[in-house]
Regions:
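Low-complexity, Pro/Ser/Thr- and charge-rich linker/hinge segments at domain boundaries
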Residues: 132-134, 235-258, 319-353
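Extended acidic/polar, glycine-enriched regions
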Residues: 267-331
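Catalytic cores of extracellular degradative/oxidative enzymes
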Residues: 327-605, 609-626, 630
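Beta-strand-rich recognition/accessory modules
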Residues: 23-26, 84, 123-125, 157-252
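Beta-strand-rich interaction surfaces with strong enrichment in secreted/lumenal proteins
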Residues: 92-95, 206-212, 284-287, 297-299, ...
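Beta-strand-rich N-terminal accessory domains
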Residues: 19-105, 109-176, 181, 221, ...
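Sec-dependent N-terminal signal peptides
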Residues: 4-14
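Terminal, non-catalytic domain-edge segments
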Residues: 21-22, 230-259, 267-269, 305, ...
Length: 802
């Protein structure tokens, strides 16, 4: 009996060993175990100088890979796996090592005598397990941060919060890609490369990979590249598949500003650089220097605003990028204010339905228009009448307006502060203070959390903005002094809670490592570090903010050379709530992009690192494109996915006020708002399946931060090599003096980050200012006399002002 069991075990072990191939790198940097069906059972890789790491993988089940859709593969010989030839199309995978990298050779063949037109797609599932479900595993899961098809090749990368990066590259064109969204929830299972795909596809994609001729075979080479951080991606991809890569540190500029363009190429000959303006005109760029395989160009933004397309071209390869030359920031804020009135700000249970009041009020602070302000006030009063219980002054619980969601309360504090800033009526600030007290009394727990949603409520940010206007009043009123003290203590308690919870706080809906929770956490920690520079935890606030920002990078389009998406955080479940499209797709940028990234400006002011300033301006420019550049119309969010079949909710022109669903394909485009026509019946507060309900007004989150951080400010950096870069202004040297011209008249402050002492002259709209500045960082301008917006980054100047 024992002998039979032993023989059975030996036979099982032999079968298992025979059926599994093990491919090891000659350099010892990776090891792949592969099943008899060609599916990776385990993959270990070394990322930089770290020890070997197991890449999470789907080795069985629906998302197992690598695999072809609807096709089983079988082992043909060692490391080679093929499908049966009885199908019209046959498929195969061969695993190999090339130049030290794990390389897959993929083949699709038409075995028939007729052309095979691809009606859906020929998908190659990677099998990387991207499901962020277990908080204990969040930091080791590789998220599909960037996938990008180009006309002649493909590249992208998966990044884990712990910083490990797995880049992918193919020297062959791949038609498209898609992600394995799990239902309508908050998780993604894996990613697929669509080797062949029907049109339409974005113009940057190959436009001819939708069929196979009789007996035609197509081949693709796919290279896996483990890296220690995303900064290595452009050069590593360029080297791995010998293509030109375009790297942009900033993807936006105002007229007259200089943008750096880096072309990384291993060919030994500089790729041809072609820059086309909005009307197709050729735009010059100057080659500054060549360092190894890095060709560094400078482009000065012309006076014509719009999209500038960049092409780096060799004999075989064609790589694209773009830069957005923007209009003045004030134009976008003004349009957002107008659009907030054209769209309905809705009586609804979710703050996302009425956030347009932010744009309506903040635009009036900088660009006053009495008629527009009166219209805003009338609409707000009608909204308030329906939503608020006149007996308590807060929620109308009979209508179940919003009493269980702390974020509705915190955002209302913000709206009331904006209303006060626009109207200067003290009763509006009184109301904001009462609502802040309500947030604290009803929702703040003994541990400082706002009902567990400390980051998501952004309660500390909104109360800090309220305190900005309370500070002067504390010097004259004991009542305001007591209010300020209560609010200050609440913010301090919330700060300690975030310092403890970090980026692992609660989220709404299905739990995951979420862009909004993690992003708001690091942004709030940066705010606390900036407003408490001498506090006992200031250094810890800053340290944790920087660490979380780095982890959050995996959920951010931090590297994409596309100004429409740069800096957008990656979120994919909002369309069903915001614009009633019942299909998951990436929304990036989405409204919550700015709430996730507003701390970048604070980190720049704390560290002086140009990287953070570029993050801030790149993401603001991406989000500002929610305003159509030509028409001024507000759109909801950008969808990076190249091809998504949806039932889109559109206006039914045959039935007034009603909508209908139509078949559409969405791909790399802005999705329109629906609140201009999808309206709530008067005096009603709809549920989410009733007429008029939608959450697309969350898009106005972008313009809150534009008003605070971007409208009044310009920035100048002197780099260690002596070169100068500007944001929201232009600069000229006149001998030893720097002459600064702000981009628009609403700029009232210029921030300098200098390597040495210098004289400066600033041509503000109302007067010129002169200063002699030492090495380091300095603000020059009106400062707190420009008191219109809560400028949290000037907090310490505020509280010490006499």
């Amino acid at each position: 009996m024992h002998r039979k069991i032993l023989l059975l075990l030996l036979a099982t072990a032999f079968t298992s060993a025979w059926s599994q191939d093990i491919l090891r790198s000659s350099t010892g940097e990776w090891e792949a175990k592969i099943s008899e069906k060609g599916v990776i059972q385990s993959l270990k890789m070394t990322f930089g100088n770290d020890k070997s790491v197991s890449v999470p993988w789907h080795s069985t089940g629906e998302y197992a890979g690598p695999s072809f859709s609807y096709t089983d593969l079988y082992k043909k010989k060692a490391f080679t796996y093929s499908s049966m030839k009885t199908y019209p199309l046959s498929h195969s995978i061969k695993y190999t090592e090339e130049n030290g990298k794990l390389t897959l050779l993929l083949t699709v063949k038409n075995n028939s005598e007729t052309t095979q037109v691809i009606e859906d797609e020929t998908s190659f599932r990677l099998g990387i397990n991207t499901i962020m479900a277990n908080p204990k595993e969040y930091f080791s899961i590789f998220f599909p941060t960037l996938l990008r098809s180009e006309k002649t090749h493909f590249w992208g990368y998966f990044e884990a919060p712990d910083g490990h990066v797995l880049a992918l590259a193919s020297s062959d064109p791949i038609a498209s890609w898609h992600l394995d969204y799990i239902g309508n929830g908050h998780r993604i299972a894996s990613a697929c490369l669509d080797l062949l795909h029907p049109l339409p596809l974005p113009q940057r994609h190959p436009q001819d990979l939708f069929s196979l001729a009789p007996n035609e075979t197509k081949n693709w080479k796919l290279v896996f590249i483990p890296l220690s951080n995303i900064n290595e991606v452009p050069s590593a991809v360029a080297k791995a598949i010998s293509i030109p890569m375009i790297h942009l540190e900033r993807t936006t500029a105002s007229p007259g500003e200089t943008t750096d363009i880096h072309i990384l190429s291993t060919g030994g000959i500089a790729p041809k650089l072609i820059i086309s303006g909005p009307q197709g005109q050729q735009v010059p760029a100057r080659l500054v220097k060549k360092t190894g395989n890095d060709y560094h160009y400078e482009m000065v933004a012309s006076e014509q605003d719009g999209m500038y397309n960049i092409i780096a071209q060799t004999d075989r390869y064609h790589t694209e990028a773009n830069i957005y030359v923007r209009k003045p920031w004030s134009w976008y804020l003004a349009q957002a204010g107008k659009e907030a009135l054209r769209m309905e700000q809705k009586t609804a249970r979710h703050r996302e339905a009425w956030m347009g009041f932010f744009s309506a009020y903040w635009s009036q602070v900088y660009l006053p228009n009495p008629a527009q302000l009166n219209e805003t006030e009338e609409k707000f009063e009608k909204f308030w009448e329906v939503m608020i219980d006149p007996q308590t002054g807060f929620y109308d619980t009979d209508k179940e307006t919003w009493h269980t969601r702390p974020q509705n309360t915190s955002w209302m504090v913000g709206v009331l502060v904006a209303r006060y800033a626009a109207t200067k009526k003290i009763e509006h600030l009184e109301l904001a203070a009462q609502w802040a007290d309500f947030l604290i009394d009803k929702f703040q727990l003994p541990n400082g959390a706002y009902k567990g949603y400390t980051a998501l409520t952004m309660g500390a940010k909104f109360i800090q903005e309220l305190m900005w206007f309370e500070v002067p009043l504390t010097k004259k009123s004991a009542v305001w002094k007591a209010r300020y003290k209560k609010h200050q203590e609440s913010v301090a308690a919330a700060a300690q809670n975030i310092l403890f919870v970090k980026d692992m706080g609660d989220t709404e809906g299905e739990s995951t490592y979420e862009d909004s929770q993690a992003g708001t956490a690091w942004s709030l920690l940066a705010m606390h570090a900036l407003t408490n520079p001498k506090g006992k935890d200031a250094a810890q606030f800053l340290k944790e903010s920087i660490a979380i920002q780095k982890r959050h990078e995996c959920l951010t389009q931090a590297l994409i050379p596309d100004s429409r998406m740069r800096g957008g955080t990656l979120r994919w479940w909002e369309a069903q709530y915001d614009v009633l499209i019942m299909r998951n797709m990436m929304n990036s940028p989405h409204a919550w992009t700015m709430r996730s990234q507003f701390g970048a400006m604070y980190l720049y002011l704390l560290t002086g690192k140009e990287y953070y300033l570029n993050v801030a301006f790149n993401v603001m420019a991406s989000c500002s494109q929610a305003i159509d550049h030509h028409t001024g119309e507000l759109r909801w969010a950008f969808v990076p996915d190249p091809h998504v079949k949806v039932k889109q909710f559109v206006q039914n022109y045959r039935k007034s006020g009603e909508g209908k669903y139509v078949d559409e394909v969405i791909g790399e485009q802005w999705v329109p708002m629906i609140s201009s026509w999808w309206r709530v019946p008067e005096q009603e507060v709809p549920w989410n399946n009733e007429r008029g309900w939608s959450c697309d007004n969350d898009v106005h989150e972008h313009f809150r931060f534009m008003a605070e951080q971007f409208i009044p400010n310009a920035f100048v950096i002197e780099r260690p090599d002596g070169s100068l870069r500007t944001w929201n202004c232009t600069i000229k040297r006149q001998g030893e003096k720097l002459v600064i011209t702000p981009a628009e008249k609403l700029v009232t402050r210029v921030h300098f980050n200098l390597q040495k002492r210098c004289q400066v002259e600033i041509a503000f709209a109302d007067k010129k200012e002169y200063a002699s500045l030492e090495k380091g960082m300095h603000w020059i301008g009106r400062g707190l006399s420009d008191y219109r917006i809560p400028s949290i980054y000037l907090w310490n100047e505020m509280i010490t002002k006499k």
